[in-house]
From Swiss-Prot:
The keyword Manganese applies. It comes from the Bacteria. It catalyses: 2 D-alanine + ATP = D-alanyl-D-alanine + ADP + phosphate + H(+). Residues 116-311 form the ATP-grasp domain. Keywords: ATP-binding, Cell shape, Cell wall biogenesis/degradation, Cytoplasm, Ligase, Magnesium, Manganese, Metal-binding, Nucleotide-binding, Peptidoglycan synthesis. Pfam families: Dala_Dala_lig_C, Dala_Dala_lig_N. This is D-alanine--D-alanine ligase. Mg(2+) 2 binds at residues 278, 280. Its EC number is 6.3.2.4. Its cofactor is Mg(2+); Mn(2+). It is an enzyme of class 6 (ligase). The gene is ddl. Mg(2+) 1 binds at residues 265, 278. GO terms for molecular function: ATP binding; D-alanine-D-alanine ligase activity; metal ion binding.
């Protein structure tokens, strides 16, 4: 990774990026995280000499993009309206190149159910699941999947609305809570074992990170607030298992069509088998975030990481 980036950096002219809009903030439930990510990206690009226009995305976005004469966009919006294909579609219509995955991959990755269906169709391991739309669905899932289970809104990130449940009564309550965030709610089998997160950048898989938290799972607090979350790089797997995880990550990303950069969350069960949970096409870039951590392990500082992401928009979209 370092040598590949060094080659890129040696020929990189930041002026060639033109006027870059950093799109951040927005109206999703992940707005606060996006504001922090955006501030870090804006600082890194500005320090590197890039001509940056910071746009906290609101109702005036179209007018801003047109009046500011934007040449390309760095999308650091998290959640709906930024990560789900809609922003990518707008930028495509305006002819503005942008970072990250395209319309289809963004929409697929934002939809946890569709992501799982694609992976299942290709024999890529992902936990058994059910869709919840009623109390009777909860009871049926209890019977078919057993406990413990984890409940998730289908289109939210940052672990928003998620809950681990150990009984049918808890499942009904968790479904009702998750439904406040999303009309579509999933429940998955709980995988007992360590969790890993793996970042991808410019077609390469970065060093996997093993996660440890005293929380029930790697929730919003553990991701962005708590100081007791543990991160291990190297991840502690033997070389064969780590390569298996890297290969599985590449295969899973190819199945969805991930471009530029992203991050995959994976569990390992007590038998050593890996299970894919979800993929994130615009991961966090805060001081607690995992992609910058993985990039550092690969030899890239934060500014180099941000420039590499932006440079990929030139390679893929001109």
């Amino acid at each position: 990774m370092t040598s590949a980036y060094d080659k890129l950096h040696s020929t990189l002219d930041v002026k060639a990026f033109g006027r870059v809009a950093v799109l951040y903030g927005g109206k999703s439930a992940e707005r606060e995280v996006s504001l922090k990510s955006g501030a870090a990206v804006i600082d890194a690009l500005t320090t590197a000499g890039v001509d940056v226009v910071a746009i906290d995305v609101g109702d005036d976005l179209l007018a801003r993009l047109q009046s500011e004469e934007i040449d390309r966009a760095f999308i650091i919006l998290h959640g709906r309206g930024g990560e789900d294909g809609s922003m990518q579609g707008l930028l495509e219509c305006l002819g503005i190149p942008y970072t990250g995955s395209g319309i289809l991959a963004s929409a697929l990755a934002m939809d946890k159910l569709r992501t799982k269906q694609v992976w299942q169709s290709l024999g890529i391991p992902t936990p058994r699941h059910a869709v919840l739309a009623s109390e009777s669905d909860c009871l049926q899932a209890s019977t078919e999947l057993g406990f413990p289970l984890i409940v998730k809104p289908a289109h939210e990130g940052s672990s928003i609305g998620m809950a681990k449940v150990n009984s049918a009564q808890e499942l009904v309550a968790a479904w009702q809570d998750a439904a406040k965030y999303d009309s579509q709610v999933l429940v998955e089998q709980w995988i007992h074992g360590p969790e890993f997160t793996i970042a991808v950048l410019r077609g390469q898989v970065l060093p996997p990170i093993a996660l440890g938290t005293p929380h029930v799972f790697y929730d919003y607090d553990a991701k962005y607030i708590a100081n007791d979350t543990q991160y291990r790089i190297p991840c502690g797997l033997d070389s064969a298992k780590e390569q298996e995880l890297i290969d599985l990550t590449a295969r899973a990303c190819d199945a969805i069509g991930i471009e530029g950069w992203g991050r995959l969350d994976v569990m390992q069960d007590e038998q050593g088998r890996f299970w894919l949970l979800e993929v994130n096409t615009a991961p966090g870039m805060t001081d607690h975030s995992l992609v910058p951590m993985a990039a550092r392990a690969a030899g890239l500082d934060f500014q180099q990481l941000v420039l590499a992401i932006l440079a990929e928009s030139v390679a893929t979209r001109g």
